[in-house]
C-alpha cells in the first residue's frame, strides 16, 4: 500500500531486504506471507539467522517471536532444473543450498489484507491482530493464503495493527465492512525494527 507518511518516488517503501531460508527447510513460504526469524523450538529443518513463516499464535507466545515483514519472493539453485530459478514463493524443497529471499521489512509500510470470517469494522481500527496461517498458499500462483483472525485486541506482541478499512469502490469485493473477509489496511505492530527486544 505504501507508508504511513506516503510514498514519494525516492522512498524505499515497498522495497525488499535480503534474507535467507535455510537449505533443506521443508515448509513452503508464499508471496505475501508474514515471516519472522527462526528461534529455538521452531522447525528443526531451519536454524538461527534464517526466516520462517509466521504461525497463528506466534504473537501470543511471547516477545521472542517478532515479525520481520512480508515475503516477496526468492531465488535458489534448483536441484531438479539444474539452474538458478526466481520464484515468487519457496516450495519447501528443491533448493541445493540456502535460498536468497526478499522481505519488505520497512517498519512504516502498510498492507491490505483480508479480514477473517467476521467482518472488521470501524470499531476495530487501532486494535492489534494476528494472522491465520491456514489455509496455506496456492502452489499454482504462489500467493499467500494468510488472512486476519477474528480477534481484535490490545495485545502488544501481535504482529499487526488495524489502521483503516477499504470501502471503495462501493459494491466491490472486499469493500463491504459488514461482511466477513472484507479488505483491511494494517501496519506492522510488533516488528523487528520497532521492538526493543532481540531474538
Outline where the language-model segments fall.
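Surface-exposed, low-hydrophobicity beta-strand/loop segments enriched in small/polar/acidic residues
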Residues: 1-199
